UniProtKB/Swiss-Prot annotation:
It holds the Pfam family Alpha-amylase. It is found in: Membrane. It is an enzyme of class 3 (hydrolase). Changing A178T: In strain: GEO. GO terms for molecular function: alpha-1,4-glucosidase activity. Glycans are attached at N102, N127, N501. Changing K115M: In strain: GEO. The keyword Membrane applies. This is Alpha-glucosidase. Residues 1-19 form the signal peptide. It catalyses: Hydrolysis of terminal, non-reducing (1->4)-linked alpha-D-glucose residues with release of alpha-D-glucose. Belongs to the glycosyl hydrolase 13 family.
Length: 580
């Protein structure tokens, strides 16, 4: 026997087993495993009967959000606006749109949110303001303080716009202002002039505004259309892309109006200031970015290429919106998830967006028979889930509601119950028409039905509170082209296996090649129409899944099992010392 004695070996064994049993996973901050919920204020709840949602209505539903497992909510812009783009054209960043309430109402909302354990985020639009903003009016008049707050250029030689730039909504990105005698840039509508971030005073004013809302208790910001903030300083023509028709946004390759490096520096500086504020106040303030960009450009919002500067806590990840379609299979789904996870810098948090005010609703994109599947996936993937209001009751687009914008169909009033205007308002005339199927798809009806999308959503958000879901690793694979499986595991904790049948036919699959899983597992969550039932035991070597089915299976890991594993390992080590 080697010099190490038996007593020493047993002491080592005891110490190691003890260490393995009590080791804690890395601590996670609140946002790293949160369930976010986007509220479109105009459509959530009308408290005064004018047919328009408001802050008081949102405030009254904070307990509801807490009950369904929401950790944080972000509001589409509640700021004062002429509503040419329904709040994304801000005329006063320091005031609330009168239809929604006032600052007192906002303060009550923040208080009620925090009382219910919910963080409150604001949608912040840094790229532009309304053309009715005081700054723009003064800039037109060449007020020395505000003259360069916007991007102005003289007409091109011979007249006309300064260059060939096209707005996101089509047509020239330049509009001539006769009073000033120059063109102003607007990457969106002519009523949304671009702010000039090359002007230090403008940048200082916008930063000051962020702290105004932080001091009112806001927990962070979603930075809308962030990659449009800067333009090429030489204002060069953009090359033709070969896509789209002349005059359409896609007809140009936007190398001079998007993803300019200066954008990232502003985000990194704002992150530095948010972190400093967080340290002073003892609460984590976060930044989220929305940018339709390349994967390389998007990942730079997390951190700089040299990893010395931190940016957004989470860029928005829209891949599930784009890739989880009716025709998607398991291989394509896995590739979509890998696309984000394999490009994300180490130690950062992924986000998974199911829907938003700019996109068709889940039920309309994938069909009512697959809504529960999407909910299962996004709530069991690692990181943050981001849900759009009404997805918990499978709300659908309503094309006939379109009145102001082609995105109106997915912005219709929240469906609370079967009463007048779906319980959204006592007024029969609401700002957008209510979806006609509201009597079937609403909170009240689904709350009373334990086999509903609502309860499925609630079960999943509750499961997200488990330590494995918050801090565990993930492994995922496909079984053929039809079945996708995702394993979440954390040493010393129960493991969870999410399984999705992406096909419209029943299938029986063998998932036994996942290591460290027992052959028999318990069904933790099953979608309402599943072949499986919560609480039942199943054999993962022959798991039967219904069409478009999804289940979450649980493998219980006892402390005794963990100790036995450690003892087995160390006994093998002892044997090596004894018999070699």
């Amino acid at each position: 026997m080697r010099p190490l004695g038996a007593l020493s070996l047993f002491a080592l064994l005891a110490t190691t087993v003890s260490g393995l049993a009590i080791r804690e996973p890395d601590a996670k901050d609140w946002y790293q495993h949160a369930t976010f919920y986007q509220i479109y204020p105009r459509s959530f709840l009308d408290s005064n009967g004018d047919g328009i949602g408001d802050l008081a209505g949102i405030t009254s539903k904070m307990k509801y959000l807490a009950d369904i497992g929401i950790d944080a909510t972000w509001l589409s812009p509640p700021f004062k606006s002429p509503l040419k783009d329904f709040g994304y054209d801000v005329s006063d960043f320091y005031a609330i749109q009168p239809e929604y309430g006032n600052l007192t109402d906002f303060d009550k909302l923040v208080e009620e949110a925090h009382k219910n354990g919910i963080k409150l985020m604001l949608d912040f639009i840094p790229n532009h303001s309304s053309d009715q903003h005081e700054w723009f009016v003064k800039s037109v008049a060449r007020d020395p303080e505000y003259s360069e707050f916007y991007v102005w250029k003289p007409p091109a030689t011979g007249g006309g716009p300064p260059n060939n730039w096209i707005s996101v909504f089509g047509g020239p990105a330049w509009t001539y202002n006769a009073a000033r005698g120059e063109y102003y840039l607007h990457q969106f509508t002519p009523q949304q002039p671009d702010l000039n971030y090359r002007n230090p005073k403008l940048l200082a004013e916008m930063t000051k505004m962020l702290f105004f809302w932080l001091d009112r208790g806001v927990d962070g910001f979603r930075l809308d259309a962030i990659n449009h903030m800067f333009e090429d300083e030489q204002f060069r023509d953009e090359p033709v892309s070969g896509w789209g028709q002349p005059g359409e946004y896609d007809s140009l390759d936007h190398i001079y109006t998007k993803d300019i490096p200066d954008v990232y520096n502003v985000v990194y500086n704002w992150r530095d200031q948010m972190d400093k504020y967080s340290a002073e106040k003892g609460r984590t303030i976060i930044l989220m970015t929305e940018a339709y960009s390349s994967i390389e450009g998007t990942m730079l919002y997390y951190e700089s290429a040299d990893r010395k500067r931190q940016g957004a806590h989470m860029p928005f990840n829209f891949q599930l919106i784009y890739d989880f379609k009716k025709e998607q299979n398991a291989v394509g789904l896995k590739s979509s998830i890998d696309w984000w996870m394999n490009n994300m810098p180490a130690r950062h948090t992924p986000s998974w967006v199911a829907g938003s005010h700019d996109h068709s609703r889940v039920a309309s994109r994938v069909g009512l028979d697959r809504v529960d599947q999407v909910m299962t996936l996004m709530h069991t993937l690692p990181g943050t889930s981001i849900t759009y209001y009404g997805e918990e009751v499978a709300m659908q687009d309503f094309k006939e509601a379109q009145q102001f914008d082609n995105r109106d169909p997915n912005r219709t009033p929240m469906q609370w119950d079967s009463s007048t205007s779906a319980g959204f308002s006592t007024n029969t005339n609401t700002w957008l028409r209510v979806h006609p199927d509201y009597a079937r798809y609403n909170v009240d009806v689904m709350q009373k039905n334990p086999q509903s999308t609502f309860h499925h959503f609630q079960h999943l958000t509750k499961l997200r509170g488990h330590r494995t879901m918050q801090s565990g690793e993930y492994v995922h694979k496909t079984v053929g082209t039809k079945v996708y499986a995702l394993l979440r595991e954390l040493r010393g904790e129960d493991s969870f296996l999410t399984v999705l049948n992406m096909a419209g036919a029943e299938d029986t699959v063998d998932l036994g090649d996942f290591v460290n899983l027992p052959q028999k597992m318990r069904v933790e969550v099953a979608q309402p129409n599943s072949k499986s039932k919560a609480g039942n035991e199943v054999d993962i070597s022959k798991l039967t899944l219904g069409p478009y089915d999804s289940v979450v299976l649980r493998a219980t890991v006892s402390s005794a099992a963990a100790i036995n594993l450690s003892i087995g390992l160390l006994l093998a080590i002892m044997a090596r010392y004894i018999f070699v």
